Amino acid sequence: MPGFTCCVPGCYSNSHRDKGLHFYTFPKDPELRCLWLKNVSRGGVSGCFSTFQPTNGHRVCSLHFQGGRKSYSIKVPTIFPLRGVNEKRTRRSSTKKRQQPNYTPAATTVLVTGLPGQEEQEVLELTAGGAEMMLLGTTAGMGAAIADVEGSSAVMGATIDAMATAAEGGSAAASNIAVKLDVGETHAVNTHFSTDASHGSHQQLQVVVVGDEPYPSADCWPSPLCSDHSYSMSSGTTTEELLRKLNEQRDIIALMEVKMKEMKSSIKHLKVTEVKLREELRQKDKDKVSPMIKSN
């Protein structure tokens, strides 16, 4: 026989494997039995334990009693080192995280070209988080219109505003605008405009704000940018449903373990029976051969 397995959720102590433990049946006293059931199921576990009625086959191991054993003074199991399936893990500032989602900076691409008549053009990437501009060689994607601005710092600010506008209203039509970019501030941009006009105080440029990535909106949680995987929950799954599923899975695993041990025991018993039958057949054959030898 495989022995008894502890019926406490998350505990898989077995009387056949754990020889040093004691296993106790639920008491017959209604009040004491109710206390046992309440403690074992951790305040009403959903799933199988929501309608759990213990029988003689359900045992609680001595690990859940103070001192490691049930006694006259210690009659109720109170030690549960493993977290129950209905016990929520406290998460630090979980409410704060939901109210203020931590977005990654969305990158908006700025296409800087010369005014009509100029052939040079550059593509810059403007990051909303740090307002950094880098040279890139990408193509134009989603468009977002911005107002006329003057100076490189104004371009950054207006572009960030355009990113927010694009996030709220979707992708708008791309528009070309003329700006005056201060050459004295273009050391971080490192443009390829090497005309004589670039040595002056300002340079006439044409800017098109385009974007490669959608900007996550505040009302979208979790963010659609997060890649899905096989263990992720759907948006409609509640914590209670997930806990119920986990509890059912644990009960199924515990049941499967018991069934596997029963099968192993049955296989062992069949092997012993097979050996006995072979021995009996051998003995019968021996008894048949003995009279024939004597007669000869």
Curated annotation (Swiss-Prot):
Keywords: Coiled coil, DNA-binding, Metal-binding, Nucleus, Repressor, Transcription, Transcription regulation, Zinc, Zinc-finger. One of its GO terms (cellular component) is nucleus. It is found in: Nucleus. Pfam families: THAP. InterPro entries: THAP_Znf. The keyword Calcium does not apply. A zinc finger (THAP-type) spans 6-64. The keyword DNA-binding applies. Its main location: nucleus. SUPFAM superfamilies: Glucocorticoid receptor-like (DNA-binding domain). CDD domains: cc_THAP11_C. Residues 240-281 form a coiled coil. GO terms for molecular function: DNA binding; zinc ion binding. Belongs to the THAP11 family. Transcriptional repressor that plays a central role for embryogenesis and the pluripotency of embryonic stem (ES) cells. Sequence-specific DNA-binding factor that represses gene expression in pluripotent ES cells by directly binding to key genetic loci and recruiting epigenetic modifiers. This is THAP domain-containing protein 11. The lineage of its organism: Eukaryota, Metazoa, Chordata, Craniata, Vertebrata. The gene is thap11.
